[in-house]
C-alpha cells in the first residue's frame, strides 16, 4: 500500500456534508492504481512495508478534468488576433482567408507527426497545472482523412503521457469550403461516412455539434445526434453561445453528456437539461477572449441544480489559453462562481460531463488514484491565486508523474 499522510484532503465527495468534502489531518491509501482508504491520522496505522509520503499539511484534491478542449490543431491565429485589435472585423478577416478555415487549412496540411508535436506542448501545459483527464475534439479537419488524423493524434497523446484522454468527433463544427451552400449534404456526409468510420476505428468516445446561426441548425444537429445514438455514442453540444438556438433543449432529448458555453440559456432550457441530467459546461476563457458581455444564467442553473463544469475550451480562435487555474479564477471573477463551485467544476462535474463520474472526479475508496498534492492548504487558494501555488506532486493511477 502507498500512503500520503498528514494531508488536508478535499475529496469533492458528492455526499459530503461539509464544504469541498474537506477532511483535516487525514491519510490517503492507494493500491493497484485506485484509492483504497481515506482515514483520520488518529486512526492510521502504517505498515513497515508501506511506501509513505508525508504531505506535511498540504492540500490534496482530485486531479483536474478539462472536459472541453480543441487542443489538436495546426498553425496559430496570432496575426488574426492582432488584426482584430486594430479594428478589422471578423467578417473581413474571413474574407482574407482567416477565421476557422485558416486553421482547417493548416490542420489539413500538417502531417500526423507535425500535429502531434504541436499539440503535445499544449497538453503538457495543462498537465503541469494538475490536469489528469482531458477531452480532445476533432473539428479542424472537416474531411475524413483530416478528422481521423486529429483523433489519431489525440489517442497517441493519451498513450504517450500520464493522462486520461477522451476523444470527441466534432465534424459538425463548421462548413468546409468544398460544401459551400450545401450544409445539408455535409451533415449527410457526417452521418453516413465520418461518424461510422470514426466509430468503427474506435476513435470517438462521443459526438459533438455546434448548434448556432453561424454553424448548424437544430434540425441538422438532430440528424447527427440520431446517427450517433444508433451507434451507441453519447452526444454533447456547443449550445446557446451567441443566441438562444434551442440546441440545449434538443440535447436534453438525447440525454446529452453536456451542453457547453450556454450564455443564452433560458429557464425552459435549464429545466430541460436539469431533467435529463445534462451538465452545463462553462467556458469563461472564450467569454473573456471574445470580450463577450452575456454571461451564463448562473442563478437559474443553481435554482434547478444543474451541475456546472468548468473547462478551458483551448483552441486557436477564441481561447488559446492552456490554464485550468486561470479558468477557475475567471469562473469566479466573470461568472460569479464560488471557489467551491469552480473546484467541483474542474473535478466532479467535469468528470460527469465526460460520463466518467464513476471512476474519476472525487476521492473515495474504489475511485481512480488520480490526484494532486498542492503547495497550499486551503482549496479556495486554487481559484484565488494564479501562477503562485502549483502542484507539489501529480499522481496518476497511483504513481507520481511530475511533468
Swiss-Prot record:
Biological pathway: Amino-acid degradation; L-histidine degradation into L-glutamate; N-formimidoyl-L-glutamate from L-histidine: step 3/3
Q: How is the cofactor bound?
A: Binds 1 zinc or iron ion per subunit.
Query: Which cofactors does this gene product need?
Result: Zn(2+); Fe(3+)
User: Which Gene Ontology cellular-component terms appear in the entry?
Assistant: cytoplasm
Q: Reaction(s) catalyzed by this protein? A: 4-imidazolone-5-propanoate + H2O = N-formimidoyl-L-glutamate
Q: What is its EC number?
A: 3.5.2.7
Q: Output one GO MF annotation.
A: zinc ion binding
- What does the entry list as the binding residues for 4-imidazolone-5-propanoate? 77, 140, 173, 241, 318
Could you tell me what this protein is called? Answer: Imidazolonepropionase
Q: What is the phylogenetic placement of the source species in the record?
A: Bacteria, Pseudomonadati, Pseudomonadota, Gammaproteobacteria, Oceanospirillales
